[in-house]
Amino acid sequence: MNIKNKLNIIKKYKYVSFDVFDTLVYRNVNKPEMIFSLVEKVAKENGLISPKCDFVKDRIMAQKLAYEISKYQEINLNEIYACINDQYLNVKQQLKEMELKIELDNIVPNKEIKEIYNYCINENKKIIVISDMYLSTENIMSILIQCGYKNINNIFISSEYRARKSTGKLYKIVQNELGVKNKDIIHIGDNKKSDFLMAIKSGIRAIHYKCNKISNLTPKQNIYRSEERRVGKECRSRWSPYH
């Protein structure tokens, strides 16, 4: 990515908005759903679930079901675990807390975007975070703070507002709540539809960030590559939670 070129574009905007996953931060796994595989591994090692349990499949199916029955555009983590297989009935809370911890433990900042963020801070830009994600605002802020993104002016998470970037509705909420004019805001994100096309459709200038995740991770951070085949089919489902 040509950082200098992006900074030249950003400099005229008062508000700079960032996507979270695969933009501000990366995970130390090749696929987002590999987090579920790590939860399964730790849960089995600690005797929390049976060795026969296929938690990865059950967790993905619970998320799919939660979307299907929800009356809102977005769901949250509590609703996902409310839909998980009854065999986890007595350990739902422990599994949910384990997932959040493993999520946090496997997050690293994106150095390229961090450079843009630091420029925005130095230039006194208003920093906004907009994410389509089932985690809570508190969860997302913990991730951002851990990665050094401490100066966030406003944060809009789809699970809290029950509206998504991918439909354009969350962008409208941002515009209305902040009273920001379209000419004063620009959004940066990796998802071509959610972060680029829908932002533009909503009247917001956008930069499509083409992430190169693997090159940003060290060999140590890629230790879970060998597990990818096991969950690959499920990982390619349309229910991927990260946009």
Language model region names:
Residues D54-E74, E79:
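N-terminal accessory alpha/beta regions
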Residues I121-I128, M133-E160:
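Substrate-recognition/cap helix-loop segment adjacent to the acidic, metal-dependent catalytic center
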Residues Y72-I128:
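Short, acidic loop-to-helix structural element flanking the phosphoryl-transfer center
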Residues G232-H243:
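Positively charged, low-complexity/disordered segments
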Residues I3-K57:
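Active-site neighborhood of HAD-like aspartate-dependent phosphohydrolases
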Residues I188, K193-Q221:
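Acidic, Mg2+-coordinating phosphoryl-transfer loop and its flanking beta/alpha structural elements
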Residues G168-K193:
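Conserved Lys-Pro-Asp/Glu-containing loop-to-beta segment of HAD-superfamily phosphomonoesterases
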